[in-house]
Amino acid sequence: EGTSFKEPSSEDLDHTFLWRCMKKLPERGRIGIFNRSYYEEVLIVRVHPNLLEAQRIPNVHPEDQTWHDRFDDINAFEKHLARNGTAIVKIFLHVSKEEQKNRFLDRINRPDKHWKFAGADIKERQYFDDYTQAYEEMIAATSTEYAPWYVVPADKKWVSRTAVATLLAGTIDQLGLTWPAVSEKQEQEIESARKKLEAE
């Protein structure tokens, strides 16, 4: 199941920054895909520290320690998930500034892609270098043995899609999954059904 996280709601802001993602975690045996996540809280909020005020956190200031504390919280949360059997795959699709510009122009110049355009994207583009610095520090601080980051070059979509598909297939393969076991009674029913169908 895929979940896209948008701007936090007032209910989200009444909880810790991890809460809304915790609610969307897949149950055991399922795959969950997060488009954005609690990592926004060490990216967008770091680039725009005024957003911390809306979170009503006592005694917090947009200084380096706030972000390091959040990195620690994220690492502890992901370690908890990994210890409980969740395979975590974190993918950063790295798009260059030039390619980002080309994609925005494509959305602007093609009416069939206007639905993808958001003025906020152009506004945020002026912070490209700030985001790059925040991404680099985030990846360095939160790439762990139990929840590593994979930085995938994404200027060419076919390259990124192939890399991501290969990565996910490899991760699933490493889980050593098997078909569900069937009882002796089910085996007998299967054999009986096969004989019946073959006799038709």
Short names for language-model regions:
Residues 1-200:
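Flexible, compositionally biased loop and terminal segments
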